[in-house]
């Protein structure tokens, strides 16, 4: 939540500028370390400390938000698929431009108990595993509503900000 909320303005402008930066955001649907407040990624209707009657706000679609802002690399991974996560991080770091890696990660204490009503961390882990599928280029969600994992978007055609600035500086010095 913090990256999408408090840090959201910085994230959007880094994507807009296509700064050569890799952001890895752990998405656990909640502000878990501060007591369980609603976050920008909290599911609609979820019960939290700050939405006791259910979250009346729809969560950000970070993929669409950042793609619209100008991000040139977007991957969504899960801690339930560590090899895919490792590969996405390597690919994101190698990518020239703004790379965003969303990592679905359980928060068994706050989100697990309060939002999803799980009794154990392993129950939440199993739920995460059941909610995901590998990305198919046609859709970011499968037909059965599962969340698509993988590299969802790459644009290698946009220039990276620092390269543009260096080119301008060099042209100016001639």
Language model feature labels by segment:
Residues 39-91:
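Conserved thiamine diphosphate
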Residues 16-19, 29, 64-72, 90-97, ...:
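Generic secondary-structure signature for well-ordered alpha-helical cores
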Residues 6-10, 33-38, 111-116, 163-164:
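Short acidic, glycine/serine/threonine-rich loops at helix termini
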Residues 105-174:
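Flexible, low-complexity linker and terminal segments
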């Amino acid at each position: 939540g913090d990256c999408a909320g408090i840090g959201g303005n910085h994230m959007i402008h880094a994507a807009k500028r296509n700064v050569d930066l890799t952001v890895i955001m752990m998405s656990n649907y909640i502000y878990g370390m501060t007591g369980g407040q609603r976050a920008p990624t909290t599911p609609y209707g979820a019960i939290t400390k700050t939405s006791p009657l259910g979250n009346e706000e729809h969560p950000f679609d970070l993929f669409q938000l950042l793609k619209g802002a100008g991000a040139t690399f977007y991957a969504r991974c899960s801690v339930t698929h560590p090899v895919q996560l490792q590969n996405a991080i390597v690919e994101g770091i190698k990518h020239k431009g703004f790379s965003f890696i969303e990592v679905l990660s359980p928060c068994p204490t706050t989100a697990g108990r309060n939002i999803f009503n799980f009794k154990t961390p392993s129950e939440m882990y199993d739920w995460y595993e059941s909610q995901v599928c590998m990305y198919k280029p046609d859709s970011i969600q499968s037909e059965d509503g599962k969340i698509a994992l993988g590299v969802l978007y790459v644009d290698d055609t946009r220039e990276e900000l620092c390269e543009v600035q260096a080119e301008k500086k060099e042209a100016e010095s001639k």
